[in-house]
Amino acid sequence: MTKSLDDAALATLFTEARTHNGWTDKPIGDETLMALYDLTKMGPTSANCSPARFVFVRSQEAKEKLKPALSSGNLEKTMAAPVTVIAAIDSEFYEKLPELFPHADARSWFTSSPAVAEETAFRNATLQAGYLILAARALGLDTGAMSGFDKGKVDAAFFAGTTWKSNFLINLGYGDPSKLFGRLPRLGFEDACVLA
């Protein structure tokens, strides 16, 4: 890959993209959610481990299950979003490695070291959720990621008896630009980077 994206694509993904707090009532169809995952899954992970799992919360019943776990500042915008993604982590992601990394016994790397498995799962699932945000923008969707929620309540409501645990939430839909805040500053290169 030697060709750079044009300015319009970079604007869609980064420079003009915003974290949204308000939403239009335009729905998101199943085919769009499937296309979103199909892009997300192509992002690289360590040993192709792919530990992220995603729950697309969209029915009223599922929203009501999620509601008690939300912080007050995230309640209204989350209930209004067409979809809220629970970006989760499968702690036993390594059970899929014979399929995902068949040329080596990668499963044993993680079953022999729970600490390495936990660290790998968290790092790579978070990375995959970042890919999902960029994939959503590439498909014309807006996002609003949040960590203001009660993980224990989400896990009890959605993941009881499973190896999945919540990481963070991402509201998904078509943003209402009138609800945007002014863009906040970002650190300059000299504050965040070192050339070594």
Curated annotation (Swiss-Prot):
Keywords: Flavoprotein, FMN, NAD, NADP, Oxidoreductase. One of its GO terms (molecular function) is oxidoreductase activity. Its EC number is 1.-.-.-. InterPro entries: Nitroreductase (IPR029479), Nitroreductase-like (IPR000415), Nitroreductase_HadB/RutE (IPR050461), RutE-like (IPR023936). Its cofactor is FMN. PANTHER family: MALONIC SEMIALDEHYDE REDUCTASE RUTE-RELATED. Belongs to the nitroreductase family. HadB/RutE subfamily. This is Putative NADH dehydrogenase/NAD(P)H nitroreductase Atu2496.
